């Protein structure tokens, strides 16, 4: 019986910020309000210095969404990820 009655899809989209010192993270509430979003995680706090993305540890967060299909879940996760904005100071050391 395990798994019976389950159908649909899920998707994770990682959040990649611009290079610079993190000033603020905005739009998390908007991202969480997207239909099908199960969670939004932000891994970094203001003051963190982002370099270019080289490894998974350089990511700033992630979004998990579900839907009736893999494509729907991915579209929802992408829409939520687009709502999250990382304000950075590109000139800070």
Which residues are covered by each model-predicted region?
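Peripheral (often C-terminal) accessory segments that flank ATP-dependent C-N-forming ligase machineries
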Residues: 1-93
